[in-house]
């Protein structure tokens, strides 16, 4: 967990765009980058108030932020998001593609609509966010995509749609890392396990042996923490701190990697 000591503003002068930053993991990432001095574009799709609350929280750190509403499943909206970000701050150094959705559904019940909804956000949108980042980032920039531990897990029923959508992102990561190298842009993906967010609250019981709908959250947390040597589950700040390292110049030799963020959990 985070300490209360002062954090060096090691990202001062950098500008970071984070998709899905109005809540959950994206919010945690936005706050951690801002604490280190980065100016932040808080992208969101629907809820204005939570996004503005993130902007206000960032202001308390002494960093600058704006919220930009854009549906990143639509390529013209991705283009507009980047143009508005550039118009406001003048340049971009860091792009974190965080937006996503999770689904558990028996394979025989998955519809075309289910498939398109999950892959449009988890996969297609991440490709075009990464594409725009590659085009618009300054030399030496950072692209950080969002995979999941689920991409490489076995034994989780009814999870093919989500797992497949994240596995594709890992392929994007390795390929973009090659293509972006001439601009000295690094491209990595993080693959978290369970992180305490609203998505966790809705879905984490699926990962607990013997889990069932309506299971008390305390039991879910205890069940998942039992797999972790650190004896807890993750919070968004844990993910944000790793992203802050990947965004820092010191991380340059980390490139084309998929970084598991599980606290050492046995999966």
Curated annotation (Swiss-Prot):
<feature type="binding site">
    <location>
        <position position="162"/>
    </location>
    <ligand>
        <name>NADP(+)</name>
    </ligand>
</feature>
<feature type="binding site">
    <location>
        <position position="195"/>
    </location>
    <ligand>
        <name>NADP(+)</name>
    </ligand>
</feature>
<comment type="similarity">
    <text>Belongs to the short-chain dehydrogenases/reductases (SDR) family.</text>
</comment>
<comment type="function">
    <text>Hydroxynaphthalene reductase-like protein; part of the Pks2 gene cluster that mediates the formation of infectious structures (appressoria), enabling these fungi to kill insects faster. The product of the Pks2 gene cluster is different from the one of Pks1 and has still not been identified.</text>
</comment>
<feature type="active site" description="Proton donor">
    <location>
        <position position="148"/>
    </location>
</feature>
<feature type="binding site">
    <location>
        <position position="71"/>
    </location>
    <ligand>
        <name>NADP(+)</name>
    </ligand>
</feature>
<keyword id="KW-0521">NADP</keyword>
<dbReference type="InterPro" id="IPR020904">
    <property type="entry name" value="Sc_DH/Rdtase_CS"/>
</dbReference>
<feature type="binding site">
    <location>
        <position position="197"/>
    </location>
    <ligand>
        <name>NADP(+)</name>
    </ligand>
</feature>
<protein>
    <recommendedName>
        <fullName>Hydroxynaphthalene reductase-like protein Arp2</fullName>
        <ecNumber>1.1.-.-</ecNumber>
    </recommendedName>
</protein>
<keyword id="KW-0560">Oxidoreductase</keyword>
<dbReference type="InterPro" id="IPR036291">
    <property type="entry name" value="NAD(P)-bd_dom_sf"/>
</dbReference>
<feature type="active site" description="Proton donor">
    <location>
        <position position="147"/>
    </location>
</feature>
<feature type="binding site">
    <location>
        <position position="98"/>
    </location>
    <ligand>
        <name>NADP(+)</name>
    </ligand>
</feature>
<dbReference type="InterPro" id="IPR002347">
    <property type="entry name" value="SDR_fam"/>
</dbReference>
<feature type="active site" description="Proton acceptor">
    <location>
        <position position="162"/>
    </location>
</feature>
<feature type="binding site">
    <location>
        <position position="25"/>
    </location>
    <ligand>
        <name>NADP(+)</name>
    </ligand>
</feature>
<feature type="active site" description="Lowers pKa of active site Tyr">
    <location>
        <position position="166"/>
    </location>
</feature>
<feature type="binding site">
    <location>
        <position position="45"/>
    </location>
    <ligand>
        <name>NADP(+)</name>
    </ligand>
</feature>
<dbReference type="GO" id="GO:0016491">
    <property type="term" value="F:oxidoreductase activity"/>
</dbReference>
<feature type="binding site">
    <location>
        <position position="166"/>
    </location>
    <ligand>
        <name>NADP(+)</name>
    </ligand>
</feature>
<dbReference type="Pfam" id="PF13561">
    <property type="entry name" value="adh_short_C2"/>
</dbReference>
């Amino acid at each position: 967990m985070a300490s209360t000591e002062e954090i060096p503003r090691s990202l001062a002068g950098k500008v970071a765009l984070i998709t899905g930053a109005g809540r959950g993991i994206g919010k945690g990432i936005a706050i951690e980058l801002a604490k280190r001095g980065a100016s932040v574009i808080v992208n969101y799709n629907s809820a204005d108030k939570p996004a503005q609350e993130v902007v206000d929280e960032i202001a308390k750190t002494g960093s600058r932020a704006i919220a930009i509403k854009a549906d990143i499943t639509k390529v013209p909206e991705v283009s507009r998001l980047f143009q508005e970000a550039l118009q406001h701050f003048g340049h971009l150094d860091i792009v974190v593609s965080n937006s996503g959705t999770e689904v558990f559904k028996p394979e025989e019940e998955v519809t075309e609509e289910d498939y398109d909804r999950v892959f449009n956000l988890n996969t297609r949108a991440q490709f075009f966010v990464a594409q725009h980042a590659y085009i618009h980032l300054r030399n030496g920039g950072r692209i950080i995509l969002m995979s999941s531990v689920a991409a490489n897990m076995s034994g989780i029923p009814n999870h093919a749609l989500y797992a497949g959508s994240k596995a594709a992102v890992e392929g994007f990561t390795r390929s973009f890392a090659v293509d972006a190298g001439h601009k000295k842009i690094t491209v990595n993906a993080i693959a978290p396990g369970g992180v305490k967010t609203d998505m966790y609250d809705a879905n984490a019981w699926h990962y607990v042996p013997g889990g069932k709908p309506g299971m008390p959250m305390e039991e879910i947390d205890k069940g998942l923490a039992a797999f972790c040597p650190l004896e807890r589950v993750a919070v968004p700040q844990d993910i944000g701190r790793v992203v802050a390292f990947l965004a820092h110049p010191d991380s340059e030799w980390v490139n084309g990697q998929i970084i598991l963020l599980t606290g050492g959990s046995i999966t």
